[in-house]
Amino acid sequence: EVLARSDVISLHCPLNEDTKHLINKDTLAKMQKQPLIVNVARGGIVDSQALTNAVNNEQILGYASDVFEAEPITEDDPLLSLKDHPRVIFSPHNAWGSESAQLTLWRILSKQVSAFIDKTG
């Protein structure tokens, strides 16, 4: 019922046996509205071929993602055919790469290395 009533479906779940291809031909068919689907979780949660068909058939309003089933994306991934589509946005999966996030990463790493040296030195 949620899929049938949703205007936006935003995916934020881990990829596991239960979530692999959670968005697939069958779940897309249950969507009565033309939702916008956003995948910032893992690429394998969306069946690439089913999603490509849904975009091309105007079954969904659009798709935005920063993840793919295989990373880096493979040449045979159906989503590549959508790279210039006006209702599709792909962006790099690099939210962790901001200056602030990198500084935090280096601080944590430095503390862990220092703690290791202190314990073993």
Question: What are these model-derived regions, one by one?
Answer:
Residues V2-L22, N39:
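Rossmann-like NAD(P)-binding element
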Residues D18-I37, S48-T52:
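Rossmann-fold NAD(P) dinucleotide-binding segment
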Residues Q34, V40-G121:
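Rossmann-like dinucleotide-binding domain for NAD(H)/NADP(H)
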Residues L11, K25-L28, P86-F90:
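Short amphipathic alpha-helical segments, especially helix-boundary/capping motifs
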Residues L15-E17, T27, R42, N94:
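Short, well-ordered turn and helix-capping elements at secondary-structure junctions
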Residues V2-A4, L28-M31, L82-K83:
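A short, aliphatic-rich alpha-helical micro-motif
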